[in-house]
Amino acid sequence: MNTFTLGLIVVAYLLSLAYLGFLGYKKTTNTSDYLVGGRQMNPIVMALSYGATFISASAIVGFGGVAAAFGMGIQWLCFLNMFVGVVIAFIFFGLRTRRMGAKLNVSTFPQLLGRHFRSRNIQVFIAAVIFIGMPLYAAVVMKGGAVFIEQIFQIDFNVSLLIFTLVIAAYVIAGGMKGVMYTDALQGVIMFGCMLFLLFSLYQVLDMNFIEANKELTAIAPLVLEKFKALGHQGWTAMPITGSPQWYSLVTSLILGVGIGCLAQPQLVVRFMTVESSKQLNRGVFIGCFFLIITVGAIYHAGALSNLFFLKTEGAVATEVVQDIDKIIPYFINKAMPDWFAALFMLCILSASMSTLSSQFHTMGASVGSDIYGTYKPRSRNKLTNVIRLGVLFSILVSYIICYMLPHDIIARGTSIFMGICAAAFLPAYFCALYWKKATKQGVMASLWVGTIGSLFALVFLHQKESEALGICKALFGRDVLITTYPFPVIDPILFALPLSVLAIVVISLMTYRK
């Protein structure tokens, strides 16, 4: 497909986003509209927005490449995304969050915990962690989307990053939560349609059915590269050797880190407060589950089965054909699928990036504008909306600058860094706000501090992937990690920080609880 046709498709896509952003702007009349869609969003729109925000481009391209390299063990992440990220999140967290949010009349995650525990310090602390930590996460998505546009249209990276940022900024700043959720829903439909087509066409390309393809994938286990065998790789339909470096990376970082970390993502939690009733929230469970099964399950499956395609066409497995794991899925799509689908897949990647990024910008803007500035400088409702818009703009500028300032190896770890901190710092306090009446504000503050500092300490001094990239431990102690004894360097920080955070909130709350 030529560049002109691609350009027309992208222009039509951008015009659709512009219209939906304008629609959100027209329907936004107060701060509640801007922050939580007036609590009257359609449950289908909410569920699609939740799923589209959940699934970023890194989940499609990055984790799809991981599946191509290491196999279907990553499908456990798909299961946790569905079971924890939707079923548990909606039923056990979402219902109570919606009721509590309406009762306390709050519009953000920091406000939810701050007002529940009657502590301004809790609200400001959570907002500060979001505003300081999330730009690094956003920079990952921004850079990924800009690089993708650069490669497709052969334009300068600086130009593609600027265009990409301006488009998202326009509909987030103007349309607020309604603009974000309307565009998320469209992007979710595009992602779902692309993955559904990929799932059905994959077996036609391989000329096999489901059982035949999986048997064949099992049979080629001896072709695993030696460097991956040394890490514990046993084949594309088997889990890695228990206790091996690959096993720890898959189980602690990807399956547990991402699978559990999603429960305390502020940009996801706020979605529960956008619908009018618990009945509407329940309707979103099936839609969310079905969306994640297709979008995530299809790409992980396609990643693993791409090895059969490359063996058939090029006589080698995926990691021999494409050295860079992040480029395996785009290369496979271009080689195996029709040209028109390659163009749609490009929109799928852009949609995944933009839906995640728009929610991040909105959350950061709400944190700095409403939760921090609005707390110390109370304003009228109309003025507060404009302050939040300025907060969104400021957050976008900070994330934009980070794309240029930080080295690639640090930015590349941004997702795991932020999700790990969110899980360790926020999850115990969030759970206790919903389920444990003996939790006190002193216990929550202790948990927030312990979770945040524990995560940062583990990232800087214990977990090798981040500590090597940051270089602080090396500069201070002359080695990449403090504890070199295996398996400590490969255990995800969440397994250090989350238990300490839970312990802190339980112990301090019991010590300070008064009937």
Model segments located where?
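Membrane-embedded helix-loop-helix hairpins and adjacent transmembrane boundary segments
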Residues: 1-515
